[in-house]
Amino acid sequence: MEDTQDLNEQSVKKTCPEADVSEPQNSRSMEMQDLASPHALVGGSDTPGSSKLDKSGLSSTSVTTNGTGVSLLAVKTEPLHSSESTTTTGDGALDTFTGSVITSSGYSPRSAQQYSPQLYPSKPYPHILSTPAAQTMSAYAGQTQYSGMQQPAVYTAYSQTGQPYSLPAYDLGVMLPAIKTESGLSQTQSPLQSGCLSYSPGFSTPQPGQTPYSYQMPGSSFAPSSTIYANNSVSNSTNFSSSQQDYPSYTAFGQNQYAQYYSASTYGAYMTSNNTADGTSSSTSTYQLQESLQGLTSQPGEFDTVQSPSTPIKDLDDRTCRSSGSKSRGRGRKNNPSPPPDSDLERVFVWDLDETIIVFHSLLTGSYAQKYGKDPPMAVTLGLRMEEMIFNLADTHLFFNDLEECDQVHIDDVSSDDNGQDLSTYSFATDGFHAAASSANLCLPTGVRGGVDWMRKLAFRYRRVKELYNTYKNNVGGLLGPAKRDAWLQLRAEIEGLTDSWLTNALKSLSIISTRSNCVNVLVTTTQLIPALAKVLLYSLGGAFPIENIYSATKIGKESCFERIVSRFGTNITYVVIGDGRDEEHAANQHNMPFWRISSHSDLLALHQALELEYL
């Protein structure tokens, strides 16, 4: 400190006799550049040869006394856009020298990169410049909207390491918080770009000669450049002094925590600053956005990830979602594998199977033979042969041995447990499904189900059944094989002869409905789902009934099946129920659906005629 006092006294004494000494132009420019950081100049006086305040260093300045014995430095400053000269005293903020000295006409400012930050330690020297406890930061010309606001804290100088781009500085309170942090810019800052803040997304070693202060805001960092503020073309119409214009204090947030929200794309400045207040011209160039919306949407992941503070309720919700999602992960595409109903659908025909479309149960009991005067033993024999073929097909190809105790109403009822695994090489015989089902009795009439692994194997079987049905619904002979195919065709012919072409007449009506684009056939049967599918295949009904339109009422009853059908197709269409029993008639009455009773061949013929004449 004593060296500093002696230095001040020497400076005062040596100024007067050497005030008229002329120095080369380049020497004066270096000295005026050094005045931009007077604390750095004094800080270098501790080492020999590094002192700037010698005789030649004071040749271009004058020292006066304010009457109290305190020496004040007076520097003649020349604003860029005004003919008036202003005098700034050493009591002002440090950044006043930067804005005036560097941009004065006739001087060539030295590049800030020529100075090393180690040469300028930022130690306070109260004998040269008084440093108040809460130092005020002076605003620059044209930014009068921040006057009278609270004083900021001391900020650390940051430098611009990346290529900056310009943002308008007029309404900072609105625009600055919404600035996106983006890097990779190729445009360079022009010295004539006025009225803008120089913005850089990165930080490096502070360079005091370039950026006296920086102001950090949430999501971004702003490093004011002395050149930018010196060229500010908006004049200070109210002539406020530097002490009356203060920046508000900003809360410092790290920039990197917001970088993941935005794409690191290349953008140019998107605003042109051509209008000036004092008549000077501005040559700020206009840049257009270089990236289209397609390029922005090509990186959706960067915008979806939001790192927000966690709350107890949110944590609980996240745990709930994770626990529920663990069971359904990979099933989203299997939740509704059935195609949605057609939008132009107008009428749904709900059919019963036994004794309506086919004659099967009455053959086994002999009731059909008695009613129509047929040979009862022959009828029962044909019924038993067809029953054997039905269950043989169900056991051999449709996993009825595994699924008999695990019956479902619809083929897609367990599809939510299917993870979509490829079944082309899957071994159903060795996956242990049947043994687990038999030992643990996991399929109960009450609806109790097994574990996740077992349910997945169950879903695999129903998916395989669906694939076989869709593959062979019009070619059952290919599924049965040559030997069984001949026996099946022989049996079908004998049954048709005994029943007087009952099935043929029913197929005529089904065919008419199937050819209509606004109508659909739905089958509801009291038979279990797997044997019902086998019946449909063996009676050549696969073309009339898609597997998604087949429901088994064994577990829930026909009325509940009708409710499911209505919920699937909607209430704005007409439902026609066709059957022979009291169950379907009662269910139709409960849902106000018209019922067409089938009790004889004449009923089938009348239905066919009504469909041909489009009464139905």
Curated annotation (Swiss-Prot):
Name of the molecule in the record: Protein phosphatase EYA4
GO molecular function: metal ion binding; protein tyrosine phosphatase activity
UniProt function note: Tyrosine phosphatase that specifically dephosphorylates 'Tyr-142' of histone H2AX (H2AXY142ph). 'Tyr-142' phosphorylation of histone H2AX plays a central role in DNA repair and acts as a mark that distinguishes between apoptotic and repair responses to genotoxic stress. Promotes efficient DNA repair by dephosphorylating H2AX, promoting the recruitment of DNA repair complexes containing MDC1. Its function as histone phosphatase probably explains its role in transcription regulation during organogenesis. May be involved in development of the eye.
Biased composition (Low complexity): 56-66
Species of the source: Mus musculus (Mouse)
PTM-bearing positions, type Phosphoserine: 338
Organism lineage: Eukaryota, Metazoa, Chordata, Craniata, Vertebrata
Tissue specificity statement from the Swiss-Prot or TrEMBL entry: In the embryo, expressed mainly in the craniofacial mesenchyme, dermamyotome and limb.
Binding note for cofactor: Binds 1 Mg(2+) ion per subunit.
Keyword Protein transport: no
